[in-house]
């Protein structure tokens, strides 16, 4: 959508004087350059396309030496010395457009239109250009400091409504919507933490409504998701109206979007809750705390964001029937192994549905990536291949993208980093929404430390079933093996066609957590559940509270978790519907809005048999994505990212009632209601 905005703004300013073609797929772009190179080539610079962009610039330079090469995006250093080094390291571009790109890029086009010579470089690169950093013909950098952000975003014509993005409504891409720009926070690890983008500007409600309607009428039937690229969705004035617009679209167009991917606001959580609760669970509430340690928060300039207020709202969130996702980062300044575990424990105690742990990336354009900050905290850094960001060019050259990550510091050893990654994987698998909600609630009811379950699953993994032990060992080794000393080492290694083929064949360069998640779901989900239940039972016993009553209660919890998690991805999954006898009404217990109902008060007069089934809607939603991305672990990795987690798990159906299948009233209800 970013290049769509730039194109629509240029078309508005220059009309028929310019011809603009947009590309998403590198194969099409390279072919177009080779067949008919343009006068100006503009490329985005994000962490997932930096090296590829440079290769495209090289191809372009060979075909049109007189053409202008324009780069733009957030992946650009903040300080002048690092910017100078950036221009030296990346030689195949002429002008950089930082921050918002519409004004800066259109200023380049305006200047280019005054040139009568076929060699536009000689004229355009002589002087500075507002909103740009220019490398002149002598290699000197020319700066301007004028503000180039557009405050009234409706001045930018919609790339959707003008038809510029129609070609991208294929069965591969997920549409993206932007309702506002800017971030009021100053987080040091983020490229949007700089003062230059502190002001939040927004598009009008009418514009957003028209774009949502356009997207819903053009999206392919097998695409069920929507990205909202706002940085604090739900927190900004007007977001409630946006959510109401989306809700109306969902009702009007059979449930689309089923899943919304976005980052919700970091403060004003009451307003965020009010905004997104109308979306029927299609958007989870993000608790992007990153850490709950006061020193860490101060060091990353997040002390103006109240984590305590976030956690205090947990009961309100539950009452609103919202999924919650907490995000934390391993390797932040002054973070220790113990402080990280404390953060995890507090988030688990707050009963958040998901706790997702990321490795700290040093992003060019963020304060934390500056040489001063890296030296201050004595970061130990390595480089990783970005998963699924690789390509083979027409020339036969292999290319991939890399990221710089923190794997240690003066406060965190490398061994600690690996251990925390193991815990991160365990949380990803075992603390995800509905799947083990009964088990976790039961442990809390017995006052057993829930975080201890996840920690002990890692600690006692040598006692796990062989297949689970192998998963853990594979995860640990992959976590170590994915690290390299330099990007040059990676880019040299990928030229080995055997190594490149290993990437294609899913043997390396994977998202380690998501890949192993897909492995477990597709190959050994039953064993994972059994292992988690074994550790939980041991913890209950170690606390001295395993007796005849709790044993029977735990048996029901055990069967419920096994039924829910059974065979989520197998081709025969619609035929393998496990049945269990239950003495307690687990569904009634779980659905108590006050969260005070005890399991012992849900004992039924007589046992019932419940069958655990998947609906046709669940089956087809997952199959739509798997059929597109491929029936492999990596294919599952991609597909599962676009499926709401509750859609994997089976639903219990009481055989006493005579109903052995779910009555699908409407596709909308089936797709959006929590199960």
Name each model-derived stretch.
Residues 1-3:
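Glycine- and acidic-residue-enriched helix-capping/strand-helix junction motifs
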Residues 6, 29, 52, 56-60, ...:
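A general structural detector for well-ordered alpha-helical segments in enzyme core domains, enriched
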Residues 9, 17-146, 638:
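Glycine-rich beta-alpha loop elements in corrinoid/cobalamin-binding modules
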Residues 38, 202-203, 249-457, 575-602, ...:
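A structural motif corresponding to the C-terminal lobe/cap of the Radical SAM core domain
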Residues 151-319, 330:
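Radical SAM [4Fe-4S] cluster-binding motif and immediate context
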Residues 418-525, 531:
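C-terminal non-catalytic alpha-helical accessory regions
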Residues 473-479, 491, 495-675:
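C-terminal accessory/interaction regions of large nucleic acid-associated machines
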């Amino acid at each position: 959508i970013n290049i769509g905005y730039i194109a629509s703004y240029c078309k508005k300013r220059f009309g028929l004087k310019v011809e603009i073609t947009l590309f998403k797929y590198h194969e099409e772009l390279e072919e177009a350059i080779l067949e008919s190179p343009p006068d100006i080539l503009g490329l985005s610079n994000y962490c997932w396309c930096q090296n590829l962009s440079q290769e495209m610039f090289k191809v372009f330079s060979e075909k049109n030496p007189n053409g202008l090469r324009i780069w733009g995006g957030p992946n650009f250093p903040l300080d002048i010395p690092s910017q100078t080094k950036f221009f030296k390291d990346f030689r195949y571009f002429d002008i950089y457009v930082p921050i918002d790109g519409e004004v800066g890029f259109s200023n380049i086009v305006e200047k280019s239109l005054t040139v009568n010579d076929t060699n536009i470089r000689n004229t355009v690169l002589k002087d500075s250009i507002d909103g740009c950093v220019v490398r002149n013909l002598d290699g000197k950098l020319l700066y301007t400091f004028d503000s180039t952000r557009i405050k009234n975003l409706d001045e930018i014509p919609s790339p959707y409504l003008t038809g510029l993005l129609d070609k991208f409504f294929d069965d591969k891409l997920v549409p993206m919507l932007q309702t506002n720009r800017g971030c009021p926070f100053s987080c040091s690890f983020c490229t949007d933490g700089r003062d230059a983008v502190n002001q939040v500007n927004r598009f009008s409600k009418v514009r957003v409504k028209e774009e949502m309607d356009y997207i819903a009428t053009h999206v392919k039937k097998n695409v069920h998701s929507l990205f909202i690229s706002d940085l604090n969705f739900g927190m900004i004035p007007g977001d409630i109206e946006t959510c109401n617009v989306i809700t109306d679209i969902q009702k009007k167009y059979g449930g689309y979007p089923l899943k919304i991917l976005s980052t919700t606001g970091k403060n004003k959580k009451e307003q965020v809750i009010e905004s997104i609760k109308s979306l029927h669970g299609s958007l989870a509430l993000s608790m992007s705390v990153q850490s709950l340690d006061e020193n860490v928060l101060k060091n990353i300039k997040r002390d103006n964001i109240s984590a305590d207020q976030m956690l205090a709202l947990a009961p309100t969130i539950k009452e609103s029937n919202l999924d919650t996702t907490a995000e934390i980062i391993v390797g932040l300044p002054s973070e220790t192994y113990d402080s990280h575990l404390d953060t995890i424990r507090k988030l688990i105690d707050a009963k958040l549905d998901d706790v997702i742990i990321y490795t700290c990336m040093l992003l060019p354009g963020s304060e934390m990536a500056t040489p001063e900050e890296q030296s201050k905290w004595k970061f130990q850094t390595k480089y990783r291949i970005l998963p699924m960001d690789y390509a083979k060019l027409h020339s036969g050259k292999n290319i991939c993208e890399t990221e710089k990550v923190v794997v240690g510091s003066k406060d965190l050893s490398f061994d600690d980093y690996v251990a925390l990654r193991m815990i991160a994987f365990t949380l990803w698998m075992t603390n995800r929404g509905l799947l083990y909600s009964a088990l976790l609630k039961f442990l809390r009811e017995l006052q057993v430390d829930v975080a201890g379950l996840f920690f002990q699953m890692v600690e006692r993994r040598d006692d796990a079933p062989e297949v689970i032990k192998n998963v853990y060992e594979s995860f640990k080794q992959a976590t170590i093996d994915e690290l390299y000393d330099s990007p040059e080492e990676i880019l040299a290694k990928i030229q080995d066609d055997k190594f490149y083929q290993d990437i294609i064949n899913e043997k390396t360069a994977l998202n380690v957590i998501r890949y192993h998640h897909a492995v477990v779901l597709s190959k050994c989900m039953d064993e994972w559940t059994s292992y988690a239940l074994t550790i939980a039972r041991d913890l209950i016993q170690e606390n001295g509270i395993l007796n005849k009553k709790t044993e029977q209660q735990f048996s029901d919890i055990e069967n419920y978790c096994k039924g829910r998690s059974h065979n989520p991805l197998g081709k025969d999954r619609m035929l393998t519907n496990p049945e269990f006898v239950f003495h307690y009404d687990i569904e009634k217990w779980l659905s108590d809005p006050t969260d005070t109902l005890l399991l012992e008060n849900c004992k039924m007069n007589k046992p019932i048999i419940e069958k655990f089934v998947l609906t046709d809607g669940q089956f087809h939603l997952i199959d739509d994505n798997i059929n597109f991305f491929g029936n492999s672990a990596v294919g599952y990795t991609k597909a599962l990212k676009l499926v709401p987690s509750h859609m994997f798990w089976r639903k219990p159906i009481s055989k006493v009632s005579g109903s052995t299948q779910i009555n699908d009233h409407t596709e909308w209800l089936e797709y959006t209601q929590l199960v």
